[in-house]
Amino acid sequence: DTMLEKNVGTLTFDVGGGIYVMNHNNSLGFAKGEMCSPGLATQAEDLYAAGVKELIHVGFAGGNKIGDYVLTDGAYNDTSITRLYGFKGELIESTKDLTDSFCIELEKKGISCIRGYHWTTDGGYVQPEWRGRYFLNDMGAKCVEMEGAGLFTIANFRSRKATAIYIVSDSGSNDEWNLGWGESTLENSIQKLIDALVKS
C-alpha cells in the first residue's frame, strides 16, 4: 500500500494480484503479497507463469527488536504447502545468489540486515513458541512469519529465484508480544526500506 501511495509504479499486468512496473525502471515491478504460505505460493505460481524471473518478498515478522531487518537464507518450515510440492525437509532455502546480490544493494543504500534462517508457520496466533523451538536452540531462527516457506517452495519447484526481507514489526523478546504498529521505530524502518527499493 505504501508503494502505491508513493505513485512509483504503473499497473501493467493483471496477474498475481496485479503487477506494477516501476516508472523509473521497467525491468522492476511490485505486487501486493498475499497472506500466508498457501496464498503467497499461489501468487508466486501466477507471477512465475507470467514470466517473472525473480521474486523478493518484503514482509513483516515477529522478532527480537522492532524495526530490525532480517534478510533470510531460507525458512524452517512449519507449513503444509511445502509437503504438497514434495519438499519434506524441515528447511527450505531461498536463492543464495539473489540473496547475496540483494544484500550488497541494501548495504550500498545504508541498510544493514540480520542475516540467517527464519521460521515460517501457518499458526499466526501461536508464534510466541518460536523462541523455544527455533531461536533458543541450535537452529537460531532470526524471526517468525507466515509466507516465506510458500514462496521458496514454488521458486525451488519451478527452478526460479526468490528471497525475502522482513521488518520486525512485533517483538517476542518478552513474555508477551509487543506490537510495533504506530511506533516511530517501525515506521522509520518501513520508509527507509521503501525509499531504498524505489531508488533501485
Residue positions per predicted region:
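Hydrophobic/aromatic beta-strand patches that form the interior of the parallel beta-sheet core
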Residues: 56, 70, 114-116, 163-165
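Metabolite-binding pocket within alpha/beta catalytic cores that recognizes anionic/polar moieties
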Residues: 1-97
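A C-terminal functional module that forms or caps the active site or interfaces directly
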Residues: 130-169
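His/Asp/Glu-rich mid-to-C-terminal helical/loop segments that flank catalytic regions of hydrolases
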Residues: 172-200
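Conserved active-site and cofactor/substrate-binding residues in soluble primary-metabolism enzymes
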Residues: 35-38, 42, 50, 93, ...
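Glycine-rich beta-alpha junction loops
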Residues: 62, 119-124, 150, 167-171
